[in-house]
Regions:
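Positively charged n-region of N-terminal signal peptides that target proteins for export
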Residues: 1-4
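Bacterial N-terminal signal peptides
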Residues: 7-13
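N-terminal signal peptide c-region/cleavage motif recognized by signal peptidases
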Residues: 15-17
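N-terminal accessory segments that precede or flank the first globular/catalytic domain
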Residues: 20-81
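Membrane-targeting and insertion segments and their boundary/processing signals
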Residues: 24, 46, 50, 107, ...
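Glycine-rich catalytic cores of cysteine/serine-nucleophile enzymes that process amide/ester linkages
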Residues: 54-120, 147-155
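Active-site nucleophile-His-acid catalytic modules used for acyl/amide transfer and hydrolysis
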Residues: 61, 116-178
Length: 178
């Protein structure tokens, strides 16, 4: 057998041993989750509220505060930027409790390696309300609103995720929201 034939045989053997499907259950789960996130990403519009359930112990505790629906532990609001959905949200940083408002891509926000579920909720916002929502979120982002570890509703200088969403909706809909 000549060198070219031997090389082709080796390449064929190598290619036949490569798997294109995930090898184990965790990889299959992540693959399915990424597919679901991709489908969700295609549905997103400005103003959508995105919810998620992080797989940490702290998220399980936070989730249990909800008396009605314990499906999620964190929330953010979508603004499309260059056709890409960015999720504005507030959470403590990983190394300390002094996190600030941030914007992450939808894929990063819902990362299946760190989260077990996500949901999308859409309010029926007018163009005027959407424009106002963008202004408010961008102002909060520029102000670098800090995470509020005390969960104090009396100030807008510090907020936690669901407080940010609620206060945003209150500004858009006034007191008719609740």
């Amino acid at each position: 057998m000549n060198k070219v034939g031997l090389a082709m045989l080796l390449v064929a053997a190598l290619l036949s041993s490569v798997h294109t499907r995930p090898h184990n259950a965790w990889e299959q789960k992540c693959s399915h989750a990424l597919e679901m996130i991709t489908k969700g990403r295609e549905l997103l519009k400005d103003g959508d509220v995105v919810l998620r359930l992080h797989n940490s112990r702290a998220s399980a505790i936070i989730r249990d505060f909800n008396r009605v629906d314990k499906s999620y532990s964190h929330a953010g609001v979508v603004l499309m930027e260059g056709g890409c959905p960015m999720v504005y949200h507030i959470m403590p940083s990983e190394d300390n409790r002094k996190g600030i408002i941030r914007k992450d891509s939808f894929l990063q926000f819902c990362n299946p390696a760190e989260n077990t579920a996500y949901g999308i909720y859409r309010y029926q916002l007018s163009r005027k309300e959407l424009a106002q929502e963008k202004i408010i979120l961008q102002q909060w982002f520029e102000k670098r609103i800090a995470f509020d570890p005390l969960f104090d509703l009396q100030t807008d200088e510090r907020m936690y995720c669901s407080e940010m969403v609620a206060k945003l909706m209150l500004r858009l809909f006034s007191n008719d929201f609740f």
